[in-house]
Amino acid sequence: MSKVCQVTGKRPVVGNNVSHANNKTKRRFEPNLHHHRFWLESEKRFVRLRLTTKGMRIIDKLGIEKVVADLRAQGQKI
């Protein structure tokens, strides 16, 4: 499974580790992903999403019903 947030679309980015001597080695910055269950009142069931903490804040702001409707409009199976 890829490390992508279902709500925001955030994915890993590539950068450098930089030592005190300014030597650089490649590394990946991973998004802060969590599996989280949300109760959908309209369907009387839980949905499990893989999302970042930013995605959780978006759900707190807009509501899970609106976010799930937007994801389904994009073609994601939820």
Swiss-Prot record:
Pfam families linked to this entry: Ribosomal_L28
Alphabetized InterPro entries for the sequence: Ribosomal_bL28 (IPR026569), Ribosomal_bL28/bL31-like_sf (IPR034704), Ribosomal_bL28_bact-type (IPR001383), Ribosomal_bL28_sf (IPR037147)
GO cellular component terms, semicolon-separated: cytosolic large ribosomal subunit
Keywords tagged on the record: Ribonucleoprotein, Ribosomal protein
Swiss-Prot/TrEMBL GO biological process terms: translation
Ribosomal protein recorded as keyword: yes
GO molecular function: structural constituent of ribosome
Homology family: Belongs to the bacterial ribosomal protein bL28 family.
PANTHER family for this protein: 39S RIBOSOMAL PROTEIN L28, MITOCHONDRIAL (PTHR13528), LARGE RIBOSOMAL SUBUNIT PROTEIN BL28M (PTHR13528:SF2)
Protein name in UniProt: Large ribosomal subunit protein bL28
Organism: Acinetobacter baumannii (strain AB0057)
Gene that produces this protein: rpmB
